Amino acid sequence: MARYRRHSRSRSRSRYRRRRRRRSRHHNRRRTYRRSRRHSRRRRGRRRGYSRRRYSRRRRRY
């Protein structure tokens, strides 16, 4: 029984590590995209709403 418990623990640990690594990568990517969006928003304008709609769709996909 102890052996099984130990195995499950190590498995969960590896899973957490993988998830954490992926999350940090995604966060950095999101930050850069957000910066670019700020600039594009100024040029095109908020009244159009097309870029905003596209961004929300992209965000959901990511």
From Swiss-Prot:
Keywords: Chromosome, Developmental protein, Differentiation, DNA condensation, DNA-binding, Nucleosome core, Nucleus, Spermatogenesis. It comes from the Eukaryota. PROSITE patterns: PROTAMINE_P1. It is found in: Nucleus; Chromosome. Coiled coil: none annotated. One of its GO terms (cellular component) is nucleus. Residues 1-62 are annotated as: Disordered. Testis. Its main location: nucleus. GO terms for molecular function: DNA binding. GO terms for biological process: chromosome condensation; sperm DNA condensation. Belongs to the protamine P1 family. Protamines substitute for histones in the chromatin of sperm during the haploid phase of spermatogenesis. They compact sperm DNA into a highly condensed, stable and inactive complex. This is Sperm protamine P1.
